[in-house]
């Protein structure tokens, strides 16, 4: 297939499973160089020779194959960069994550790809997701290894959620052992993200891998509900899309009508999780309970044999409740509001 088809509609090209006739070249009237690195992997770099000041930005979507809206947004980002409609001010790696699951219209084929990073894919060698996790790790590591010394590194991993949420759009920051940066929290505010969830333990997500192993300012964005390709109201994603485009193009954060910057998001910290011990797990919440629903002290939320989870703080909120996960995996997170102390500690 010609390279123009790749750049004009990255999503359709990737779903078709073709390799481009040319795997690198120039676009945007010669202002941008591009390189196809494999299925769903596309790198861009400005042609101008001012590399020392450039940030390196990885933007990903489709780590879950049925989370279509961010995939569509990324395809439009590629189109606009290639056409010169959006300037490029950074090194950029665009990633469509679980391409076979995207083609099948499924979240994943064998295993949740976003639980297989930081080497965990080696524990499930028969999984169809395992080679892709290893490939995405290698691509990210190579991309950030080539970053100019001392330059900014970002990873924005865009998702949509299975269920409704008290905060429709929220972010998750991986645990790195240090407080979140002001740059990230302010960028999330500019993206109109209402809430941020801080992990307190290491994980196996894509954003955790890039934060820990590549030194990136990384986040997972949850931007709304899962819908099939072509059925998304992309206007609902406009603030996040604008923020990503500004990050890529070197634009400035928005200023509101009063001359100030957008409000910072509320911050919640993970204080525990419900782990599925067996198929006997019972979650005592409604099947359609929204993410960030609050529960009072003393509420029993789960039972699995001798295991029971009871709320011990004045208020805890549940995020990602899912009793259908495989035994050994997380069936829900419990978080508390830590906005004041987190904002005070920003660096």
Curated annotation (Swiss-Prot):
Enzyme Commission number: 3.5.1.96
Enzyme kind, highest EC tier: hydrolase
InterPro entries: AspA/AstE_fam, AstE_AspA_cat, Aste_AspA_hybrid_dom, SuccinylGlu_desuccinylase
Cofactor binding comment, as recorded: Binds 1 zinc ion per subunit.
Superkingdom of the source species: Bacteria
Active site per UniProt: 222
Physiological role: Transforms N(2)-succinylglutamate into succinate and glutamate.
Record protein name field: Succinylglutamate desuccinylase
């Amino acid at each position: 297939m010609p390279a123009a088809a790749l750049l004009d509609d990255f999503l359709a090209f990737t779903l078709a499973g073709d390799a481009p006739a040319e795997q690198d070249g120039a676009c945007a009237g010669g202002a941008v160089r591009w390189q196809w690195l494999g299925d769903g992997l596309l790198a861009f770099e400005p042609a101008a020779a001012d590399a020392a000041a450039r940030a390196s930005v990885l933007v990903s979507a489709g780590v879950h194959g049925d989370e279509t809206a961010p995939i569509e947004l990324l395809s439009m980002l590629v189109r606009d960069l290639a056409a010169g409609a959006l300037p490029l001010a950074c090194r950029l790696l665009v990633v469509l994550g679980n391409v076979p699951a995207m083609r099948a219209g499924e979240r994943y084929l064998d295993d949740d790809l976003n639980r297989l990073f930081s080497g965990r894919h080696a524990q499930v060698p028969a999984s169809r997701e395992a080679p892709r996790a290893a490939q995405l790790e290698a691509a990210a590591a190579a991309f950030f290894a080539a970053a100019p010394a001392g330059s900014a590194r970002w990873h924005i991993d865009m998702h949509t959620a299975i269920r409704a949420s008290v905060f429709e759009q929220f972010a998750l920051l991986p645990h790195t052992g240090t407080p979140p940066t002001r740059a990230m929290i302010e960028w999330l505010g500019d993206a109109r993200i209402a809430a941020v969830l801080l992990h307190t333990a290491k994980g196996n997500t894509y954003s955790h891998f890039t934060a820990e192993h590549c030194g990136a300012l990384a986040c997972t964005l949850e931007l709304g509900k899962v819908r099939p390709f072509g059925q998304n109201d992309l206007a609902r994603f406009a603030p996040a899309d604008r923020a990503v485009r500004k990050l890529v193009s070197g634009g400035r954060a928005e200023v509101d009508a009063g001359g100030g910057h957008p409000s910072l998001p509320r911050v919640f910290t993970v204080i525990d999780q419900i782990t599925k011990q067996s198929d006997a797990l019972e979650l005592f919440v409604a099947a359609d309970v929204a993410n960030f629903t609050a529960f009072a002290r003393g509420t029993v939320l789960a039972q699995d044999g001798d295991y029971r989870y009871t709320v011990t703080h004045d208020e805890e909120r549940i995020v990602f409740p899912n009793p259908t996960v495989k035994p050994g995996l997380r069936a829900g997170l419990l978080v508390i509001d830590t906005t004041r102390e987190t904002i005070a500690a920003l660096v």
